[in-house]
């Protein structure tokens, strides 16, 4: 059975006036534009939140027997999400020494199905919980019983009731950002089995709260006679059913999976609704003609540009997701769970050979920068470029001469390589010959025949460089124009940048196809980046 669930894990909400009445059937009423708003400050977002009633609490009952039942029912469905990597069954995908002990990533039928944590959102909720405890607010978590045995077939039901005052949550995040972020950093730096076990228990509790809350929410909508298809549309999903499918069972199986449930629950805490609000065009901004777009470029002084593989296609470097691109080539050449697995850090550690056989195809060579790269360099020279966030690893921005201070290599580059074991870092040219031979570059310092030098590109499952967060926090204060060029905006957290920027900052998309829907750009140019640049330069005469 094939099920398609569209939109990524940052679930979008349709808020325009024509759909507002429908939305209110599913979620609480969205306030009008003159409703008082609060701003949430965090590492990853600067979002406007709606005011919530001080007396309103969330009551969540957790039943582990129910959770196990959800896991077993959900196991028979395969969900495919565009731009959203759901829970990965590591033991199916990767062959390592431990995988033989597991089936589908868990030891027995009673264990939770999910394998990976969505760390950004987990940390957001951790912040909330920890600050509530430290400030002795009205939040309380009471365990009425907690005995669960997973090593045998016996499972005792655990019931937990959580009461969360939403206004207090927002106030704490708003007023204690630095302190909360420091606390999360301290947690992340802790080393020791006892601390790790404590963290695992905390994450497990968060996931159970989220999944139980979403299950309860679904049951309420079902009991009210809400149409299941309309329910999924209103929270940003498209559900396609086959004959005899039980719609509510499928919805429950998908939305109560760990990552999805945590995202929805986090949205509810932030926005008092399951779906995240999306950006609309600036009503007062007129970009109805190309001439007006050119005028905007001329008047802007702090331009932020997000570039993807589309800006390098004309250089002879294939992009990743289009027809004939990198992922299609990988799919034909290798027997992988999915093409992206070649760039998954877990897969790399378990089986590095496929990546190093393919690395030759994407290793920077003698390619020359495109007209788009040269245009970004021109903006830099004219003092208009605030930052270029590039998702590319081809280093052509460096070749074009863009000031390195104005450049953020979001996904790293081949310029250096680091041993996965001893962390020795060497210049990328050191491993070039080995990669050209399609061999694994072993670490000479470890000299154990197994440790290898990994190019310092960011794999799925790895954190972005610290410089990314540092620059984002600075740039959102100064930016006056955001440009997205040649990017599918499918990989987080870079794909979140258009949402982070103040909604009154103009945004332009230059790409071969429309992306990030239902997010609205103020001007969209569907075509080649180089052609846009040529058309623009013909008008502005720089």
From Swiss-Prot:
Residues annotated as catalytic: 411
Biological-process GO terms, alphabetical: autophagy; heterochromatin formation; negative regulation of gene expression; positive regulation of gene expression; sorocarp development; sorocarp spore cell differentiation
Any single GO CC term annotated in Swiss-Prot or TrEMBL for this entry: nucleus
MF-aspect GO terms: histone deacetylase activity, NAD-dependent; metal ion binding; NAD+ binding
CC cofactor note: Binds 1 zinc ion per subunit.
Top EC class of this enzyme: transferase
Residue numbers binding Zn(2+): 419, 422, 443, 446
Region (Disordered): 1-37, 136-160
Annotated Gene3D superfamilies: SIR2/SIRT2 'Small Domain, TPP-binding domain
Record keyword Calcium present: no
Compositionally biased spans, kind Low complexity: 8-25
Enzyme Commission number(s): 2.3.1.286
Cofactor(s) listed: Zn(2+)
Catalytic activity annotation: N(6)-acetyl-L-lysyl-[protein] + NAD(+) + H2O = 2''-O-acetyl-ADP-D-ribose + nicotinamide + L-lysyl-[protein]
Keywords: Coiled coil, Metal-binding, NAD, Transferase, Zinc
Coiled-coil blocks: 165-193
Segments forming domain Deacetylase sirtuin-type: 283-542
Highest taxon in the source lineage: Eukaryota
Pfam families reported in the protein's UniProt record: SIR2
The protein's name in its UniProt record: NAD-dependent deacetylase sir2D
